[in-house]
Amino acid sequence: MKRIVLETNRLLLREMTLSDMGALSSILQDERVMYAYNGAFSDKETFAWMQKQLQRYKDYGFGLWGVILKDTNEMIGQCGITMQEYKTAQVPEIGYLLAHKYWHKGYAVEAAMACREYGFNTLKFDELYSIIRDTNVASQKVALRNGMNPIDYIVKHYREVDMPHLVYCVKK
């Protein structure tokens, strides 16, 4: 049974299982979706991404969850909370990634807001972050609508590329 973590008006956020690999692959292997990661993932990278989420569920009790449309039961993306390195600490980050055809419909904001409430009320974090590539304006707008403000500018080295990022934060 797939554990449902959060429910909103239109969405369920639930732990993923290996049976979600098909839906996850179609998202992570889409160049349009993955432009902030410097390109689509290979099959190997997609499987490693899934394994990382499954391990996060075991280690922390949270991670990136599958975003499911209640009306159709379709997995349309991922949203959740992960621990990410920022400066010299691990901080809780709200992350989101949706299939291209579901962009600009309010789903990312709806899921991110639910994660913010979960992070504060259930996980008892005092601060939540979103670390977003500087070119990813749509995700920056989601962070702002989620009550976050930009607090820093960092460079992350990922896939052999230096990628500037903006750090957003909201306090409880």
Task: Give the predicted meaning of each segment.
Residues 32-52:
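Conserved GNAT-fold acetyl-CoA-binding loop/helix
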Residues 53-66:
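A short helix-loop-beta-strand connector motif used in the catalytic cores of GNAT acetyltransferases and
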Residues 1-34, 68-172:
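Acyl-donor (CoA/ACP) binding surface of acyl/acetyltransferases
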Residues 41-45, 63, 90, 135:
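Short, conserved alpha-helical segments within structured domains
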